[in-house]
Curated annotation (Swiss-Prot):
Binding, [4Fe-4S] cluster 1: C19, C55, C84
Protein name stated in the entry: Ribosomal protein uS12 methylthiotransferase RimO
Domain MTTase N-terminal: residue ranges: 10-120
Molecular-function annotations in GO: 4 iron, 4 sulfur cluster binding; aspartic acid methylthiotransferase activity; metal ion binding; protein methylthiotransferase activity
Enzyme Commission (EC) number: 2.8.4.4
Name of the gene: rimO
Main location group: cytoplasm
Record's GO cellular component terms: cytosol
Gene3D superfamilies (alphabetical): Methylthiotransferase, N-terminal domain, Nucleic acid-binding proteins, tm_1862 like domain
Length: 447
């Protein structure tokens, strides 16, 4: 009697670097591979081939990408490279000539085909019986997911090379976005994080064309998209919002509890001179007035932003202007980066004085200390208040979660002590009272 052995599934290792947009690209590739019967493994040693999704936004990200590619080659030998750094394939091949394939961002089919070339899918695989969840493969915890609504960007910020890597704005059909959101919610997702290169430009490229979802007309526009997402009964958080005038239309939705009162707006600087050099909107006085107006309409509004210090041409006067602006703006969550030249960025050609590295570091230190004091004071005002917390982790010390003013990975946490025998699990939403705070985090007790 002969024994029939079933061939094992081909195995793929995957490393995803960079921003949430790249993470969504990775999820899409992995979903396709899983549908074709590939098994995703967690170690280089177990993989038949390794895919590295790179980041190429700044030099440190490129260095990390090259390092990870080298590590994958050393540990496995068969490496496929994709992502933003892939647009400059020669740089990758000069350092790592043995890579099997190099593709740029959003080239999903080429990546899958490259995997096929190295390790073909099983011929006997039946995709109709494969256990790929309806929402696809996700690299985030089950209770939150990134929802990418567009690709590319129409802006020409002088420090950025995103348009050259990801192209001009291409908005996803509104029906497709809402169908994906509905599948995610049905699968148990409690928080949708809306992302793109420029979320508030959604629909500009198609002139806000009217689409259809659930038999109803819906404009391909951020306001209408948020209205529809807000009807799904989950947290909806907006990231990468460019401060267009129509952002004002979102504040009533936040005040009414339809979407989270949270805006992630990368202002980048406040000095009119530096903003002009960056090719960013230079209406910092109007921005302060808008922030004041937003908070009058929605007192719970949380504003997150990112800034760059040490940009070419930045003087001490410009930097002090930025600190004074921060004092006026009273932003809740802030990140700061020291300017780093990016190959191919227009800023490299500016006729402006280069800021020395030691001055950049000094300004970064002062910026962070200044904003920490603002953040600490604003969080102190939360003590004694009742908040809803979405639980991310539970261990023997208690639970770690986030309330509406905390995005995962980039903002603070809420630490909660739990009684013995507690049934609280990741993904639960619980009501808590804030008992303490520091510069970034809150401590709370369960109600």
């Amino acid at each position: 009697m002969s024994t029939v052995t079933t061939p094992s599934a081909p195995k793929v290792g995957f490393v995803s670097l960079g921003c949430p947009k790249a993470l969504v690209d990775s999820e899409r590739i992995l979903t396709q591979l899983r549908m074709e019967g590939y098994e995703v493994v967690a170690t280089y040693e177990d993989a038949d081939v390794v895919v590295v999704n790179t980041c190429g936004f700044i030099d440190t990200a490129k260095a990390e990408s090259l390092e990870v590619i080298g590590e994958a080659i050393k540990e496995n030998g068969k490496v496929i490279v994709t992502g933003c750094m892939g647009v400059d394939a020669n740089v990758i091949r000069d350092v790592h000539p043995s890579v099997l394939s190099v593709t740029g961002p959003q080239q999903y089919e080429q990546v899958v085909n490259a995997v096929h070339d190295v390790v073909p899918p099983r011929k006997d695989h039946n995709p109709l019986i494969d256990l790929v969840p309806p929402q696809g493969v996700k690299l985030t915890p089950r209770h939150y997911a990134y929802l990418k609504i567009s690709e590319g960007c129409n802006h020409s910020c002088s420090f950025c090379i995103i348009p050259s890597m990801r192209g001009k704005l291409v908005s996803r059909p509104v029906g497709d976005v809402l169908d994906e959101a509905k599948r995610l919610v049905k699968s148990g997702v409690k928080e949708l994080l809306v992302i793109s290169q420029d979320t508030s430009a959604y629909g500009v490229d198609v002139k806000y064309r009217t689409g259809f979802w659930d038999g109803q007309p819906v404009k391909t526009r951020m306001t209408e998209l948020c209205q529809a997402l807000g009807s799904m009964g989950v947290w909806v958080r907006l990231h990468y919002v460019y401060p267009y005038p129509h952002v004002d239309e979102l504040i009533p939705l936040m005040a009414a509890g339809k979407i989270l009162p949270y805006l992630d707006i990368p202002f980048q600087h406040a000095s009119p001179k530096i903003l002009k050099l960056m090719k960013r909107p230079a209406f910092e006085d109007k921005t302060l007035a808008r922030i004041k107006n937003w908070r009058e309409q929605c007192p719970d509004l949380i504003i997150r932003s990112t800034f760059i210090v040490g940009f070419p041409g930045e003087t001490e006067e410009d930097f002090q202007y930025l600190l004074d602006w921060l004092t006026e703006a009273q932003l809740d969550r802030v990140g700061c980066f020291q300017y780093s030249p990016v190959e191919g960025a227009p800023a490299n050609l500016l006729d402006a004085a280069i800021v020395p590295d030691d001055v950049k570091q000094d300004r970064w230190d002062r910026f962070m200390a200044h904003q920490q004091a603002i953040s600490a004071a604003r969080l102190q005002m939360k003590i004694g208040k009742e908040i809803e917390v979405l639980i991310d982790e539970v261990d023997d010390r208690g639970a770690v979660g986030r309330c509406f003013f905390d995005a995962p990975e980039i903002d603070g946490n809420v630490f909660i002590g739990l009684e013995e025998g507690s049934t609280v699990q990741p993904g639960d939403k619980i009501m808590c009272r804030v008992t303490d705070a520091d510069e970034y985090d809150l401590w709370a007790e369960m109600l």
